[in-house]
Amino acid sequence: MDLFDLTLHELHAKLKSKEVSSREATSAMLDRIAELEPRINAFITVTPERALAEAEAADRRIAAGEADVLTGIPLAVKDIFLTEGTLTTCGSRILNNFIPPYSATSFEKLKQRGMVLLGKLNQDEFAMGSSNESSASGPCRNPWNTDCIPGGSSGGSAAAIAARQATVTLGTDTGGSIRQPASHCGCVGLKPTYGRVSRYGVIAYASSLDQVGPLTRDVTDCAIMLGALAGHDPKDSTSVDRPVPDYQAALTNDIRGLRIGLPREYFIEGLDPDVQASMDQAIETYRRLGAEFTEISLPHTDYAVASYYLIATAEASANLARYDGVRFGHRAEQAEGLLEMYSRSRSQGFGSEVKRRIMLGTYALSSGYYDAYYLKAQKVRTLIMADFIQAFEGVDLILTPVAPTPAFRIGEKVNDPLQMYLSDIFTIPVNLAGTCAMSLPAGISGQGLPIGVQLIGKPFGEETILRAAHAFEQATEWHSLRAPL
């Protein structure tokens, strides 16, 4: 087996036994990236010199007996995470020359434990998109079919896992941006509960919705990564100060008596037949493992997408006001006066999807429309939260599709924003409710594209999700399938 094929826990065992070195594993990954990038475009920036230096430092730690499970493991992160001294663009022209002076807490935690940064991953511009087509660095492609999108906005994070270009990756999830790409690329993607992982140093899209999470090849790796990322951060007032469980200890495979809800609103007319078939197979697998199913209702699901796109764009309008060309990022030349410089810098620096969302958010917050749009959307969000609270009174987990269809072709929906937005119809409610959810490989379409199912847990119920996901993984082979590169 090639070194780039190993999971995190498999590579750790070989590093610990000194069967391989971190430098060897890192070199194998860098060679893989160089080989496949012309076809996949998963990376915006590759950092070979930094990676090899960090790998050699990790090997010294391992030799000194100071290593843990993450030391020497090759990692790549979405280009939304600040990485001190390394270009961070957020997929946008407006940040095409931005070198941050500090690092995101989530990345810094992994760096301190000896992980090796391979580079920064492609994404939709400012995490605004469901297909990775809005990136200023060009679209990322799905390793299972390079004519198809990998999902978004963390498309590069999922594609790099599927293409074996990184052992693990980091992404962010505002309305499904970890789970939808994970489903389309056949990997595991977890959106933790809001506040479980620090957002400090992550470029903000919608601050009340954004959350950091891992994308991995299997559930064990996901549990390891979540344990490393979770915890209170005094630099992030929205991070929650509560103990971090031993997530690996939750992987018991015993789910007898687990109560799983099936929300009737998610099994809609128009659901792709292959997605429905994968859901049916997943339900049958869980029944064999001893889980009990109950039909539930999440009655305000139909209003989730509209509510989300008012709240998220309103927050984006405020968050992106800081990009004006003055202190950092793209600055327009030949502007006559300050206001024209602001206008030209933003017009040249932002792409069309970002401009669309800024305009929508500004409109929703404007005088005379605030009550009708933004305030009403927040009221709907409260109702969606209440739906989940009520549903979880009778079940332990909720099982749903991740996306209505498998990955679609590049360019298919780029001129139809509404159809693009509906790609996240099953993932958005989780962000509005602030709870946790995972995408888990569960099938292959007739066209050979991966299909995931979504496990939704109670707030801070990641242990239950991981237990159920691991049991499913051990009973199936979907996670072990490889993209035909």
Swiss-Prot record:
SUPFAM superfamilies: Amidase signature (AS) enzymes. Its EC number is 6.3.5.7. The active site is at residues 78, 153, 177. PROSITE patterns: AMIDASES. This is Glutamyl-tRNA(Gln) amidotransferase subunit A. Allows the formation of correctly charged Gln-tRNA(Gln) through the transamidation of misacylated Glu-tRNA(Gln) in organisms which lack glutaminyl-tRNA synthetase. The reaction takes place in the presence of glutamine and ATP through an activated gamma-phospho-Glu-tRNA(Gln). It holds the Pfam family Amidase. It comes from Pelobacter propionicus (strain DSM 2379 / NBRC 103807 / OttBd1). One of its GO terms (molecular function) is glutaminyl-tRNA synthase (glutamine-hydrolyzing) activity. It catalyses: L-glutamyl-tRNA(Gln) + L-glutamine + ATP + H2O = L-glutaminyl-tRNA(Gln) + L-glutamate + ADP + phosphate + H(+).
